[in-house]
Design a protein with these regions (language model features):
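Bacterial Sec-dependent N-terminal signal peptides
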Residues: 1-25
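Domain-level representation of secreted and single-pass membrane ectodomains enriched
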Residues: 21-230
Length: 230
């Protein structure tokens, strides 16, 4: 069995707050005249958070895997069976879908079968566009896959823009996972010292002597769409 692992790398400042480096090349979504309230919504009900946290107490103590922050809703939404297309006055078009995870702290997504020809753009953002990931281009896609950073709040809107010159070119996008964040990055950072798993190496020990420059920074990885490693 071939197992695909989508890993997202996010950089954090370890202070009172955790600030993620925003993914993408910058830019603004093209849906200026489309109100978020009008976009078709797919609602995911809240998972059993109490049961998940009870499992986390055991997993965190044993340190046998990533620190789980979210619940993965496995899905197979794509441009054919979900969302809606909008025509633009410039001759281009946009595919949009709104994903809502009830009572989530964050929402992050895993894309499969993603094709972004030159000139097309992908964005993921929250409902008031105060947090925007993108633009994503073909340069951000690896073997048809892309995992996003965590969008704050319980809503993530996906917008795929097709440039006018590309309307005859086939495009593809599937949403494989919609992750409901029930724990936060702040909880992970505040878990304290001496809590690393047995797969980690302490850079302040002799084994880490060769990593003197790197230890001044910190990297947080999103593993399996719903866990943190650092």
């Amino acid at each position: 069995m071939k197992i695909k692992l989508v890993t997202v790398c996010a950089f954090f400042s370890f202070g009172l707050t955790a600030l993620a480096q925003i993914q993408g090349d910058g830019g603004m979504p093209k849906s200026k005249t489309i109100q978020p309230a009008a976009v078709k919504t797919v609602l995911f009900q809240e998972p059993d958070v109490a049961a998940l946290r009870a499992e986390d107490l055991i997993n965190d103590a044993e340190k046998t895997g990533p620190w789980r922050f979210g619940y993965n809703n496995d899905t197979w939404m794509n441009m054919e069976n979900s969302g809606e297309w909008y025509e633009l006055t410039n001759g281009g078009k946009i595919w949009m879908i709104k994903l809502q995870c009830k009572n989530a702290y964050t929402v992050n997504l895993t894309f499969e079968n993603l094709v972004i020809p030159k000139g097309n753009e992908l964005y993921v953002y929250n409902e008031d566009k105060s947090f925007i990931l993108g633009k994503f281009t073909g340069n951000h896609v690896y073997e048809g896959q892309l995992g996003t950073e965590l969008v704050p709040g319980e809503v993530a809107i996906v917008e795929y823009y097709v440039a006018p010159q590309n309307t005859a070119i086939p495009v593809s996008l599937s949403i494989d996972k919609v992750t409901h964040g029930y724990r936060t990055a702040s909880e992970y950072i505040e878990k304290g010292l001496n809590t690393s798993g047995n797969c980690n190496m302490n850079v302040n020990c002799p084994d880490g002597a060769a990593w003197g420059d790197q230890k001044r920074g910190a990297v947080m990885l999103v593993s399996g769409s719903n866990g943190f490693c650092s």
